[in-house]
Amino acid sequence: MTSKSVVVLDYGSGNLRSAQRALERVGASVQVTADADAAAAADGLVVPGVGAYEACMTGLRKIGGDRIIAERVAAGRPVLGVCVGMQILFARGVEFSVETSGCGQWPGSVTRLQAPVIPHMGWNVVESGPDSVLFRGLDADTRFYFVHSYAAQQWEGSPEAVLTWSRHEGPFLAAVEDGPLSATQFHPEKSGDAGAAVLRNWIERL
């Protein structure tokens, strides 16, 4: 079977090589690039992200990444956001009282977690539903690796989206599956066999 082609979008943020290796281990043919044509042509596009929301959006817009994402989603082409790469898919992020416009693929805001210990760092379970493709075949007690201080803590998007939740004091979105657009707040590339299973499930949809 021919390997699925995946572009990891290089806009100056994210664990690019870790993501590349994790995707290659589950059978994808991976290119790390900022090239719009390559990103448009690939079977799947991964949008990583670490650090500040505003800095990520600045880097993304600099390479036209917001347009690349929008065009792929409009055409029904799969996109996977990871960590801050998930957060920037929402309409806005609020950090230190500064509001930054995101890609706007989903309505709503990314805000600081309301917990005494920040960042939320370490392994945590998630609550996925029976309709999830990303978590297919995984047990309910499976843990994933998180490191973040901000998250989407409510959902204002399509009622048909498949939502997966986790908790750090209060609930937050751990993953969203919404047509061609999927995202995880945790790092699948740092989540061992569980993360590999999520990536494999995503690639099998391409």
UniProtKB/Swiss-Prot annotation:
- The entry's active site is C83 (nucleophile), H187, E189
Keywords per UniProt: Amino-acid biosynthesis, Cytoplasm, Glutamine amidotransferase, Histidine biosynthesis, Hydrolase, Lyase
Its primary localisation, in coarse terms, equals cytoplasm
Show the InterPro entries listed in the entry. Answer: Class_I_gatase-like, GATASE, Imidazole-glycPsynth_HisH
GO CC field: cytoplasm
- CDD domains the UniProt entry points to: GATase1_IGP_Synthase (cd01748)
Q: Taking every annotated instance into account, which residue ranges of this chain make up the domain Glutamine amidotransferase type-1?
A: 5-206
Q: Which reaction does it catalyse?
A: 5-[(5-phospho-1-deoxy-D-ribulos-1-ylimino)methylamino]-1-(5-phospho-beta-D-ribosyl)imidazole-4-carboxamide + L-glutamine = D-erythro-1-(imidazol-4-yl)glycerol 3-phosphate + 5-amino-1-(5-phospho-beta-D-ribosyl)imidazole-4-carboxamide + L-glutamate + H(+); L-glutamine + H2O = L-glutamate + NH4(+)
Q: In which pathway does it act?
A: Amino-acid biosynthesis; L-histidine biosynthesis; L-histidine from 5-phospho-alpha-D-ribose 1-diphosphate: step 5/9
The record, for Gene3D superfamilies, names: 3.40.50.880
User: Which molecular function GO terms apply here?
Assistant: glutaminase activity; imidazoleglycerol-phosphate synthase activity; lyase activity
Q: Where in the cell is it found?
A: Cytoplasm
* Name of protein: Imidazole glycerol phosphate synthase subunit HisH
Gene assigned in the entry:
hisH
